[in-house]
Amino acid sequence: MKNYSKNATHLITVLLFSFVVILLIIPSKCEAVSNDMQPLEARSADLVPEPRYIIDVPPRCPPGSKFIKNRCRVIVP
C-alpha cells in the first residue's frame, strides 16, 4: 500500500509542477502573438528612433567630374 501512495504523491507533484510551468509559459506566448499581429509600422516605430537632424550632403564625385542635376558629370575640356 505504501508504494501506491508514494507513486500517487510523485504523480501529483509532477502534475502540479507542469501546471505551474504551463501557466507561466502561456501568457508570454500570447503576448508574443499579440505583438506579431500589430502592423509593421507600429512595431518598427518603437524600435527605430527617427533621426532628428537630416543634413543634405551632396555626394562626392571622382576627380575631373562635377555634380550636375543629381549626377556626377565628366567635364570635357
Swiss-Prot record:
Q: What is its main location?
A: secreted
Whether Disulfide bond counts among this entry's keywords is: yes
Q: Does the keyword Hydrolase apply?
A: no
**Signal peptide stretch:** 1-32
Propeptide residues, chain positions: 33-52
Q: Which UniProt keywords apply?
A: Antibiotic, Antimicrobial, Disulfide bond, Fungicide, Hemostasis impairing toxin, Immunity, Innate immunity, Protease inhibitor, Secreted, Serine protease inhibitor, Signal, Toxin
Disulfide linkage:
61-72
UniProt GO cellular component terms: extracellular region
Q: Which superkingdom, per the lineage?
A: Eukaryota
Role summary:
Serine protease inhibitor which exhibits antifibrinolytic, antielastolytic and antimicrobial activities. Displays antimicrobial activity against bacteria and fungi. Likely functions in the innate immune response to microbial infection and possibly in the venom, as an antifibrinolytic agent. Not toxic to mice but does induce slight sedation at higher doses (from 40 mg/kg). At a dose of 80 mg/kg, sedation occurs 15 minutes after injection and is accompanied by piloerection and hypothermia.
Q: What is this protein called?
A: Secapin
Q: Which organism is it from?
A: Apis mellifera
